[in-house]
Amino acid sequence: MVVYGQDCLDEISLSAPTSVCEIKDGTFGEYVITPEEFGMTRCTKEELVGGTPQENAEITKEILAGKKGPARDAVVLNAAAALHVAKEIPMQDAVKLAEELIDSGKAQKKLEEFVSLTNKLAEKE
């Protein structure tokens, strides 16, 4: 799956339709998706602009802690695309799964495990 937000983003966009190219069962397909198809509200690109690495880390922590809004919706849609491909499930189901993983705290726990592992590896250097 390759996606291109029609607002020049290299990911699924919340501010414009997204063009998708996908190979499924050996067949190449092209289609367009919109945030509204997945129950998301369209927003402006400016609402999704990050900041410094520290600010982006804080935004990520807030999303994984349950904060709703455009940033979370962008994370959900793009995580859903990865789940759609990896688990071979419909995008609608992948969106629900991404939301469940965030809402249950499993995504936050996985991030904490990753941070712990990378810190341990850094200490060994």
PLM feature spans:
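Glycine-rich anion-binding loops and their surrounding alpha/beta cores
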Residues: 1-125
